[in-house]
Amino acid sequence: MATPTFDLADLKRRMQGAVNALKHDLGSLRTGRASPTLLDPIQIEAYGAVMPMAQVATISVPEPRLLSVAVWDRGMVSAVEKAIRESDLGLNPMTEGQTIRLRIPEMSEQRRKEMVKVAHKYAEEARVAVRHVRRDGLDLLKKLEKDGAISQDDEKRQADQVQKITDQHIAEVDQTLAAKEKEIMQV
């Protein structure tokens, strides 16, 4: 059996993965501003299969509170419109030829606060994921030191590096959350 080795770059990659997942999750949160990622969860029944919106249309933001969905195939317009209406986003599509316009309504203060709570939940999940990666790294270092593969000084030095990159990624999570919270609360 091969002896496990400590790879700091792998830990960084895994921690960054948690941060990227947070950014993706926060991107799908409705903020009262138009964002193409708002339509990511919507699936369209097309050509005998279910596919994401991005595979049947181009989504653009002509105004801060307006999404424009340019459907590529004229025959798909009604399916896209139906999927938008049936989604839980509460959007009312207005169709003009092959283009569907979606006005993004203002969110109430209560709804904004609910969205901030959801954003905090996502951020906490990301922090926990980063800490799990840190724990995995520290456990491996302790095992390597116990097995005599590295010295106690090396274990301490590497553990300090793991803590440093953990702190950096937690700070990135906090910055991402603060930016999203500001965006949500903006009227």
From Swiss-Prot:
Organism: Methylobacterium nodulans (strain LMG 21967 / CNCM I-2342 / ORS 2060)
Keywords carried by this UniProt record: Cytoplasm, Protein biosynthesis
Localisation: Cytoplasm
Protein name, per record: Ribosome-recycling factor
A single BP term in Gene Ontology: cytoplasmic translational termination
Function: Responsible for the release of ribosomes from messenger RNA at the termination of protein biosynthesis. May increase the efficiency of translation by recycling ribosomes from one round of translation to another.
A Pfam family per the record: RRF
Keyword Protein biosynthesis tagged: yes
One GO location term (cellular component): cytosol
One of the record's GO molecular function terms: ribosomal large subunit binding
Main location (coarse class): cytoplasm
InterPro entries (UniProt xref): Ribosome_recyc_fac, Ribosome_recyc_fac_dom, RRF_sf
Presence of the UniProt keyword Cytoplasm in the record: yes
Disulfide bond annotation, renumbered to this chain: none
CDD domains, per database record: RRF (cd00520)
Record-stated family: Belongs to the RRF family.
Transmembrane segments annotated in the record for this chain: none
